[in-house]
């Protein structure tokens, strides 16, 4: 290839996008197949034979496809699901609040027991020892 030659690029192969080439091949194959089928059915008609794919009786019982649910039913289902979700959240929040409340009552009761003191102002050891024993039992269980 000489730089002075104007036709030097014409001799090179043209760039072919593989995707485009593949899609063109597929289209070509589909049209060819469709043409073959069309000619086949034309030949059958000329010979007076019925097409193989179609049943002889037009009144054959065909299974009816289930129709999709309409907008109102879908909206009702969505509304019901939202309501169930809301109730579930509400129940979980209620349970959480009850648990927090019971824990705070327990803490207040313990605090009152641990505050008890003798007439001279010394703290009572009985409730403190019981509290420590309860803590040890909880640690052993878990």
UniProtKB/Swiss-Prot annotation:
Subcellular location(s) per record: Nucleus, Nucleolus
UniProt biased composition (Basic and acidic residues): 99-115, 131-142
InterPro entries per record: Fyv7/TAP26, Fyv7_fungi
GO cellular component, one term: nucleolus
Record's keyword terms, sorted: Coiled coil, Nucleus, rRNA processing
Gene Ontology terms: biological process: rRNA processing
Predominant location category: nucleus
Domain of life (superkingdom): Eukaryota
A Pfam family assignment: rRNA_processing
Residue ranges of coiled coil: 94-116
Annotated spans, Disordered: 1-23, 47-67, 99-142
TM regions (residue ranges): none
Biological role: Involved in the processing of the 20S pre-rRNA.
Family of this protein: Belongs to the FYV7 family.
Protein name as it appears in the record: rRNA-processing protein FYV7
Organism, as annotated: Candida albicans (strain SC5314 / ATCC MYA-2876) (Yeast)
Lineage: Eukaryota, Fungi, Dikarya, Ascomycota, Saccharomycotina
């Amino acid at each position: 290839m000489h730089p002075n030659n104007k036709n030097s690029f014409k001799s090179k192969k043209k760039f072919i996008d593989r995707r485009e080439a593949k899609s063109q091949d597929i289209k070509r194959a589909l049209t060819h197949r469709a043409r073959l089928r069309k000619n086949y059915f034309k030949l059958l008609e000329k010979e007076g034979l019925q097409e193989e794919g179609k049943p002889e009786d037009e009144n054959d019982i065909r299974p009816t496809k289930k129709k999709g649910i309409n907008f109102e039913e879908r909206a009702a289902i969505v509304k019901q699901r939202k309501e169930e979700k809301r109730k579930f959240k509400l129940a979980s929040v209620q349970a959480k609040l009850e648990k927090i409340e019971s824990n705070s009552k327990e803490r207040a009761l313990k605090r009152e027991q641990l505050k008890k003191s003798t007439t001279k102002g010394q703290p009572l050891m009985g409730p403190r020892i019981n509290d420590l024993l309860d803590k040890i039992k909880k640690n052993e269980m878990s």
